[in-house]
UniProtKB/Swiss-Prot annotation:
InterPro entries: Calycin (IPR012674), Lipocalin_ApoD (IPR022271), Lipocalin_CS (IPR022272), Lipocln_cytosolic_FA-bd_dom (IPR000566), Retinol-bd/Purpurin (IPR002449). This is Retinol binding protein 4. The gene is RBP4. Keywords: Disulfide bond, Methylation, Retinol-binding, Secreted, Signal, Transport, Vitamin A. It is found in: Secreted. One of its GO terms (cellular component) is extracellular space. Residues 1-18 form the signal peptide. It comes from Felis catus (Cat).
């Protein structure tokens, strides 16, 4: 009888794996995404890091939409250089629309040359516009369609974080992106508030 239960367990595990499709093309994004409602200030609460040097914590992003409907963003955060030099740095991004309202091509660069620059996919996986947002980008695909180098942010409107019911939604989205337990929490301790010029790049 034990072998019957073993088979049932294996079938259940196989079914769970089959349900989670980790090919990037299978990931769902926010339907009918509204850039205007998304604009404004967002605080990064958690991040799945990519390869390269990016903002590390105290990350605050400001999204805006111009009169032509073009979305752009600026972000400020702390970066640690040479293992012991903390500076506040700025990044800038411009977004090109695609056929899907929640999928963009984002050209980004650091105001300081040591930060990464590139032109990545930028997908809004989910948001309620007023509380939370989950962003995702795959920079390099594996041959099987899964992602070899990705990054993802969990944003909040409130710098103090997300309420428990929203955290549950966010964890579900992270799992759907096959990134469960791969995020690190982003500290907001005011490091980049009121810094003197020599500490800002």
């Amino acid at each position: 009888m034990a072998w019957v239960w073993a088979l049932v367990l294996l079938a259940a595990l196989g079914s769970a794996r089959a349900e989670r499709d980790c090919r990037v093309s299978s990931f769902r994004v926010k339907e009918n995404f509204d850039k205007a409602r998304f604009s404004g200030t967002w605080y990064a609460m958690a991040k799945k890091d990519p390869e390269g040097l990016f903002l590390q914590d105290n990350i605050v992003a400001e999204f805006s939409v111009d009169e032509n409907g073009q979305m752009s963003a600026t972000a400020k955060g702390r970066v640690r250089l040479l293992n012991n030099w903390d500076v506040c740095a700025d990044m800038v991004g411009t977004f090109t629309d695609t056929e899907d309202s929640a999928k963009f091509k984002m050209k980004y660069w650091g105001v300081a040359s040591f930060l990464q620059k590139g032109n990545d996919d930028h997908w809004i996986i989910d948001t309620d516009y007023d509380t939370y947002a989950v962003q995702y980008s795959c920079r390099l695909l594996n041959l099987d369609g899964t992602c070899a180098d990705s990054y993802s942010f969990v944003f909040a409107r409130d710098p103090n974080g997300l309420p428990p019911d929203v955290q549950k939604i966010v964890r579900q989205r992270q799992d759907e992106l096959c990134l469960a337990r791969q995020y690190r929490l982003i500290v907001h301790n005011g490091y980049c508030d009121g810094k003197s010029e020599q500490n800002i790049l």
